[in-house]
């Protein structure tokens, strides 16, 4: 296998690259990994019960490594299209800094390591969900869904939604309705988030033949779908209050954040077809990231606030 960009042959299998530690770190998709770590940590915090801090730290590290491993496998498989798309052309493999075979080996080793250590140190249910998540993202999404259906993000979004469920399972050794709701918040959030990106990166996706919804169904259909998923996400995000594992205060915060999320999605819906600047889509993409962090932060604050207040009361 050979990686080629506009300047010719950049890296070949069988040749040792001169990659730096930073290049290998970039293979892990650190921005995506940070969101995975954050939501997994939220699952740990929100779960009833207790986990030893050392085991909790090991769990988070294993989840982070597993997420990074799936990112490396994704970059290995997608090197051909990454070399063409402007936002991915400088990734380590298409840029020639890491050979594809090295990236594959790196991803496989980290995958096995993260799953085995999580199983041995914490429990095998959480390790099993982590293994399934890696497989789903690297194989089901990357190798099949991404290039075959405009619903790639809808179905494939499950991979990014599992981390809080894994964190929850690390503490409880179970999958519950509460952890399923945490899963659903991210699962329903994903289409609006990524289709906003797909709108202002339509040409990139068209150039590499990835059937993102805007390229297949058009801007108008995509905008309707974005609004629909924003509404579903906002509704799902207030469910913890109704199900009793978050307070009314959290519910009000989630409702306010959801209203802004829906407002931003409606701004995208109102955007004229063919708009070259795509400013509403870019704003929605940016806010959607803040929204998810804010919702899970609010959940954790809601969970920890009574504990912190009770401890503070003991100091006076």
UniProtKB/Swiss-Prot annotation:
GO molecular function: protoheme IX farnesyltransferase activity
Membrane-related topology note: Multi-pass membrane protein
Subcellular location: Cell inner membrane
Pfam families (alphabetical): UbiA
Family: Belongs to the UbiA prenyltransferase family. Protoheme IX farnesyltransferase subfamily.
Function description: Converts heme B (protoheme IX) to heme O by substitution of the vinyl group on carbon 2 of heme B porphyrin ring with a hydroxyethyl farnesyl side group.
Name of the featured protein: Protoheme IX farnesyltransferase
Protein's organism: Rhizobium johnstonii (strain DSM 114642 / LMG 32736 / 3841) (Rhizobium leguminosarum bv. viciae)
């Amino acid at each position: 296998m050979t990686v080629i960009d506009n300047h010719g042959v950049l890296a070949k299998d069988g040749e040792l690259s001169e990659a730096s530690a930073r290049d290998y770190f970039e293979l892990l998709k650190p921005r995506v990994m940070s969101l995975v770590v954050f939501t997994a940590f939220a699952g740990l915090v929100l779960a009833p019960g207790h986990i030893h801090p050392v085991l909790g730290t090991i769990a988070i590290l294993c989840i982070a490594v597993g997420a990074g491993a799936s990112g490396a496998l994704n970059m290995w498989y997608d090197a051909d299209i990454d070399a063409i798309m402007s936002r991915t052309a400088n990734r380590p493999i298409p840029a020639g800094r890491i050979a594809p075979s090295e990236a594959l080996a790196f991803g496989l080793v980290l995958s096995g390591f993260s799953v085995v250590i999580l199983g041995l140190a914490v429990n095998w249910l959480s390790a099993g969900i982590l293994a399934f998540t890696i497989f789903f993202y690297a194989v089901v999404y990357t190798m099949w869904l991404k290039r075959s259906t405009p619903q790639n993000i809808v179905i494939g979004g499950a991979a990014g939604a599992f981390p809080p469920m894994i964190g929850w399972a690390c503490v409880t050794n179970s999958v519950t309705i509460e952890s399923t709701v945490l899963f659903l918040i991210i699962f329903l959030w994903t289409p609006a988030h990524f289709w906003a990106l797909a709108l202002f990166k339509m040409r990139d996706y068209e150039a590499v033949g990835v059937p993102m919804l805007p390229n297949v169904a058009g801007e108008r259909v995509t905008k309707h779908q974005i609004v629909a998923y924003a509404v579903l996400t906002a509704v799902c995000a207030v469910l913890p209050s109704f199900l009793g594992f978050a307070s009314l205060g959290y519910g009000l915060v989630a409702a306010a954040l959801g209203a802004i999320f829906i407002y931003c999605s409606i701004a995208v819906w109102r955007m004229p077809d063919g708009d070259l600047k795509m400013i509403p889509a870019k704003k929605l993409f940016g806010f959607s990231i803040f929204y998810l962090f804010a919702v899970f932060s609010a959940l954790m604050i809601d969970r920890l606030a009574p504990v912190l207040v009770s401890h503070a009361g003991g100091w006076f």
